[in-house]
Amino acid sequence: MRHSPRKRFGQNFLQDKYIINEILRAINPLADDNMLEIGPGLGALTQPLLQKLNQLTAIEIDTDLQSYLTCLPASQGKLNLIPADALTVDFCQFGPHLRVVGNLPYNISTPLLIYLLKFITCIDDMHFMLQKEVVERIAAAHGTKAYGRLSVMLQYHCEVEYLFDVPPEAFEPRPKVDSAIVRLTPYRVSPFESVNTEKLENIVAKAFAMRRKTLTNNLKGIISLSQLNDLGIDGGKRPEQISVAEYVQLAKFISN
């Protein structure tokens, strides 16, 4: 099929067979898995997944691609295609133990990752191809330049594994940036205290609103320097120097 990639959907189609096989190896799909693919595109990953699975659900927003995907020989009787924007879908409707995969459009990858956290109790694992810079941010340790809101929110909910890089020449058209594969596995037993996710997201967003300012400055009116000291958190530090566990402490304090 000749399909002109659409800029508004951030489309870059994976074509490199070696990379596709490496992604499949990382996912390790089993026949009875409850698997969902976001943005299947031209089916580079969809078709080999269908060969291994009894059933695959896929969410595709592009109407041209929806028609193409339903006509693939491998899709017959096995592909459950949802014509929708992934940012509007209730992922828990597909049942428990959901395994989510996808080459996420770079223009919506961050909001989509944050959105998926709402359905984390229904998800067993997630394997995504993302812009390399986004994967670096997700996996970043506190105290590093890449560490930010996305790092805290995803590391609070999931074990993060940076798997491997994908060069631009693996795609058509070639993106101007490198890509990478990440595995996100929601904790069954969390290493962190349980807190209100909305409160955590709010405190993290405020803390990182101005990265060059101190935590005390960014959280002015929410928590005082003396209260930070009582929690054992250095208010003179910048937001990227505060660990996930410390942000959890802050969210718990605000909730109380």
From Swiss-Prot:
Which reactions are catalysed by this chain? adenosine(1518)/adenosine(1519) in 16S rRNA + 4 S-adenosyl-L-methionine = N(6)-dimethyladenosine(1518)/N(6)-dimethyladenosine(1519) in 16S rRNA + 4 S-adenosyl-L-homocysteine + 4 H(+)
**Where found, per UniProt?**
Cytoplasm
- Primary location class: cytoplasm
The EC number(s) this enzyme carries: 2.1.1.182
A GO molecular function assigned to this protein is: 16S rRNA (adenine(1518)-N(6)/adenine(1519)-N(6))-dimethyltransferase activity
Q: Which domain of life is it from?
A: Bacteria
Q: Do the record's keywords include Isomerase? A: no
The record's listing under InterPro entries reads:
KsgA/Erm, rRNA_Ade_diMease-like_C, rRNA_Ade_Mease_Trfase_CS, rRNA_Ade_methylase_Trfase_N, rRNA_adenine_dimethylase, SAM-dependent_MTases_sf
Record's keyword terms, sorted: Cytoplasm, Methyltransferase, RNA-binding, rRNA processing, S-adenosyl-L-methionine, Transferase
TM ranges = none
Summary of the function given for this chain in its UniProt record: Specifically dimethylates two adjacent adenosines (A1518 and A1519) in the loop of a conserved hairpin near the 3'-end of 16S rRNA in the 30S particle. May play a critical role in biogenesis of 30S subunits.
State the similarity comment: Belongs to the class I-like SAM-binding methyltransferase superfamily. rRNA adenine N(6)-methyltransferase family. RsmA subfamily.
Write the protein's name. Ribosomal RNA small subunit methyltransferase A
Q: Which organism is it from?
A: Legionella pneumophila subsp. pneumophila (strain Philadelphia 1 / ATCC 33152 / DSM 7513)
Q: Which gene encodes it?
A: rsmA
